[in-house]
């Protein structure tokens, strides 16, 4: 199993698909990496030589951030938005949609499960 950027790539998948298992690499970027490394995108990972895997590693390192560094960068950007108390930071803090979507209906994924009324709870009486 080839290990690239701290991720074990699945051996039985094509190289272009296997690279998308790395956080920060989608289909277009995977194809760009493979063409820069002179590797056939349709070859399976198990068929790649050690030299080809090393070339892929070098291209990924040169191309930009992936995996842990990218996750840390994204988290820092969100934390900065929260600290400067921007509107987007407020939406992140309240776990609401950030990019202008409606929330009256929908947005259940972002808002979480419904918090309905609690059965059996009575208000305190005045004495």
From Swiss-Prot:
Coiled coil: none annotated. One of its GO terms (molecular function) is tRNA binding. GO terms for cellular component: cytosol; small ribosomal subunit. It holds the Pfam family Ribosomal_S13. Residues 93-127 are annotated as: Disordered. GO terms for biological process: translation. Keywords: Ribonucleoprotein, Ribosomal protein, RNA-binding, rRNA-binding, tRNA-binding. InterPro entries: Rbsml_uS13_C (IPR027437), Ribosomal_uS13 (IPR001892), Ribosomal_uS13-like_H2TH (IPR010979), Ribosomal_uS13_bac-type (IPR019980), Ribosomal_uS13_CS (IPR018269). HAMAP family: Ribosomal_uS13 (MF_01315). Located at the top of the head of the 30S subunit, it contacts several helices of the 16S rRNA. In the 70S ribosome it contacts the 23S rRNA (bridge B1a) and protein L5 of the 50S subunit (bridge B1b), connecting the 2 subunits; these bridges are implicated in subunit movement. Contacts the tRNAs in the A and P-sites. Belongs to the universal ribosomal protein uS13 family. PANTHER family: 30S RIBOSOMAL PROTEIN S13/40S RIBOSOMAL PROTEIN S18, SMALL RIBOSOMAL SUBUNIT PROTEIN US13M. Part of the 30S ribosomal subunit. Forms a loose heterodimer with protein S19. Forms two bridges to the 50S subunit in the 70S ribosome. This is Small ribosomal subunit protein uS13. It comes from Acidobacterium capsulatum (strain ATCC 51196 / DSM 11244 / BCRC 80197 / JCM 7670 / NBRC 15755 / NCIMB 13165 / 161). The lineage of its organism: Bacteria, Pseudomonadati, Acidobacteriota, Terriglobia, Terriglobales. The gene is rpsM.
